[in-house]
Structures are given as structure tokens and as C-alpha cells.
Amino acid sequence: MTTALEEQNTQQASVAGRVVRVIGPVVDVEFPRGELPALYNALTVEVTLEAVAKTITLEVAQHLGDNLVRAVSMAPTDGLVRGAVVTDSGKPISVPVGDVVKGHVFNALGDCLDEPGLGRDGEQWGIHRDPPPFDQLEGKTEILETGIKVIDLLTPYVKGGKIGLFGGAGVGKTVLIQEMITRIAREFSGTSVFAGVGERTREGTDLFLEMEEMGVLQDTALVFGQMDEPPGVRMRVALSGLTMAEYFRDVQHQDVLLFIDNIFRFTQAGSEVSTLLGRMPSAVGYQPTLADEMGVLQERITSIKGKSITSLQAVYVPADDYTDPAPATTFAHLDATTELDRAIASKGIYPAVNPLTSTSRILEPGIVGERHYAVAQRVINILQKNKELQDIIAILGMDELSEEDKITVQRARRLERFLGQNFFVAEKFTGIPGSYVPLAHTIDAFERICNGDFDHYPEQAFNGLGGLDDVEAAYKKMTEK
């Protein structure tokens, strides 16, 4: 919350209460009259289980009246009993901020997992903060060049914007996020913060080891609240990561990238907490506060004058249903959407971005330029026409198409393959080096393909390569054989 509120809360620190009820991760605590902790305050309680002492952190979620508060535990409550003494910290959950967090792994409470105790002696910020004032927001729109052809041409990302990666399980959301972290560190020497929300512990370990191996870990802070942890942790880990990113933006005046994998798990954790707190469920069983919780997180991810937080959020789509309230609520906050399609992945084209359903609000002539916009529209029109012709091809075959339509289909197939690209993070699996294609080269390449300059090249020459130089090299190799 605000600094004034934190100062007020600090004055109330060390107030002691006692546990009166424990139901799973929900704990009711009674405090002396007139000394109730504020909402979102962190409470601590000492627990001994099998001769091992530990401290459990709780977060105040509700005031029940009669000097009672209902809190959500940030750890398993095994061993917690009625009558246990609970201490009010007088402030929200706080995490370390600054250069000390780079290259390390933290949990949602700000505890360093790879170097215990790191950062606790330095500056810390509460995870509940207000968004920047409206008059401080940046009004300028700028493209974030990624070097990934399909993204830069058809769904350009906004510097300081919010981008959603939509897709079902196993279509490449996490791989694309890892690739973006690598590219930002290599090309821009930028600071990144990765928030792992409710995902697999194995994925977090793999990410840490891969980033260490590729030499980008020193510019990245990682915050994890994985799927084996209580819902309170999974609901707060995104805010913890965002708070670290805000410090780099507001104090160190850096452009920061915030990666959230997976924003659906944030919603899912909120639903679990809502049910545990006894709230009436809303549509499809989600919490009635879904839109509010999403807004509180997303409104803090923004650009202020001279510095920005650009957020890339993986969005799991339950059963590939885009009308589900969780992805639908996320849509409203995004500047660009990148939809990963299982049908494209099944063709072996990666990244499996669907160019016809992915969108960007800045794909306009006034922002990206007339030529970029014109080439992007030509590519989309060819791919759309090819899609419309698929039913005719399936029933009657290619021979029944007009000559013009045959050319359209052949160019569309080349475009589809050329939209694929080798990734740096996939080098060790494919044995093929990753590629960074500048935006100017991308526009030129797709314009030439649309013009028919490569109609005599076989489709195989366009498979998942970088720029036109790679295509020409592949064609030369094929003709030599």
C-alpha cells in the first residue's frame, strides 16, 4: 500500500494475538481490542513439528468482527494449534529489491532459496503498492524488436506493454518465454524478472540451469511459487516479482522485462483462496473478485516517463476454450496477443504462432510505418485466402484451383514455413544455431516472397530458418545434391 499506511502499520508492530481456528491454509486469529492488524499485513507464528521449529507467515485477508481476523497461510499449517501466539509485523509481506536480487532465486516471501539470508539486511519493499499516478505515465508508443520474424512483422510488441502468450498445454509457451529472456539479455543487456506462478518445480530448475549455462542469469531475478505450494503463495508470487521489477524501473530508471508463467495459475490460486474464505463463486466457479484481482496486478505493469516494465505473460487456456473467464479477463489488459496453435505445432513449425488470430494494437501505419503495415497485411491476406481454399483442396484437389489460387496456396506454404525460426534455447536439442533477424530484413524478406521472387524455390528451403541468406544457402545446397 502507500508509504503512509506502512508507517502507520509499523507503529502497530509486535502486537500479539492467538490462533482460534485452523482450517487448512485458512487461520482465524484473535487480537486484543483496538489492535487489529490492517488488511494485507503479514503475521508470523512459531510452529514446532517433530522437534523441528519453523516460522509460518500469514497474510490478513478479512476482518471478521469481535477482534478476529481471517488470514491465509503462506506455508503448510501442519503442527499449528489453537492458542499459538501470532505476531503482527505491522507491514505487508516485503521482498528485497535492487541489484542484490539479480542472479538469484527467491520465494514469494522474499527469502533467497539459493543463498539463504541474502537481501534481508538491505532495502525491502512491500508487495502491495499503488500503480503510478496517471500524470506520470508514458504517452509515447515504441516497438520492442525481438528478432523473431512472426512476432516483429505480424504481432509487434509494445515497449512497456503487456503481451499475452495464449495456448493449451505443450505448444511452447514456456520455451518462447525462455527465448525472450535470452534475446533481451543478449541484444539489449536488459534486466529481467521471472515470476513462476504455480508451474512445475522441474521447469523452474531447468530454467535456472539453462540461464546459468547461457550466461544470462546475472541479469535476471527469479521468483517462484510453484504448484506444490499453498494457494496463498501462488496468489502473491506475481506481486513479489512485480515489486522487484518496479524498483528497477522507478529507482534505477531501467527498462525492465517481467515474465509471468503462468498468469492462469494466478487466477486459479485466487479462486482457491476465495473458496477457502467462503465467498460465493461466480461464473464457471471462479472468484467474484476475478476482474478486480487481475486489474490490481495489471495496472502496476506500465511505463512511466523515461522507463518501462514490459510484461510477457503465458496464459494457459483451459481445454483450449478462449471464452473461459480466466483468459477472457486477461485479454482486456493486453496490448498484444500471441496465440500458439496446436495445429501449427503439429506441422513442426516453431514458434507455433497463429498469424491469423494473434493481434497487436500497434500494427497500424501511423506507428509501425506504411511499408511494414502493407507487407503485414499482404502476408495475412495470402494466409487467410489459403485457409479459405483448404476445403476445396481437401475435396477436389489442387488441380481444380485457378492458376491465381494455385500461386496463392504455394506462396502461403512458403510463408508458413518461413514464419518458423530457430531459437537460441533450442540449439542443444536441434543442433541448429538460433537466429536474430532485424525487423528491416524481416519486412524485406516477406515483401519479396509475396512478390513471387522465390516462387521457383522448393518449400523445403524455407523450413524454420532465419533470414533470406539462410533460405538461399539451403536452396543452393539442395540444387547441388
From Swiss-Prot:
Protein name (database record): ATP synthase subunit beta
Enzyme class: translocase
Membrane topology: Peripheral membrane protein
InterPro entries xref list: AAA+_ATPase, ATP-synt_VA_C, ATP_synth_F1_bsu, ATPase_a/bsu_AS, ATPase_alpha/beta_chains, ATPase_F1/V1/A1_a/bsu_N, ATPase_F1/V1/A1_a/bsu_N_sf, ATPase_F1/V1/A1_a/bsu_nucl-bd
Job description of the protein: Produces ATP from ADP in the presence of a proton gradient across the membrane. The catalytic sites are hosted primarily by the beta subunits.
GO cellular component, one term: plasma membrane
Positions of ATP binding: G167, G168, A169, G170, V171, G172, K173, T174
Keywords, in A-Z order: ATP synthesis, ATP-binding, Cell membrane, CF(1), Hydrogen ion transport, Ion transport, Membrane, Nucleotide-binding, Translocase, Transport
Matches recorded under PROSITE patterns: ATPASE_ALPHA_BETA (PS00152)
Reaction equation(s) it catalyzes: ATP + H2O + 4 H(+)(in) = ADP + phosphate + 5 H(+)(out)
Subunit note: F-type ATPases have 2 components, CF(1) - the catalytic core - and CF(0) - the membrane proton channel. CF(1) has five subunits: alpha(3), beta(3), gamma(1), delta(1), epsilon(1). CF(0) has three main subunits: a(1), b(2) and c(9-12). The alpha and beta chains form an alternating ring which encloses part of the gamma chain. CF(1) is attached to CF(0) by a central stalk formed by the gamma and epsilon chains, while a peripheral stalk is formed by the delta and b chains.
Record EC number: 7.1.2.2
Disulfides per UniProt: none
An MF annotation (GO) of this entry: ATP hydrolysis activity
Name of encoding gene: atpD
Organism: Corynebacterium diphtheriae (strain ATCC 700971 / NCTC 13129 / Biotype gravis)
Family that this chain belongs to: Belongs to the ATPase alpha/beta chains family.
Cellular localisation: Cell membrane
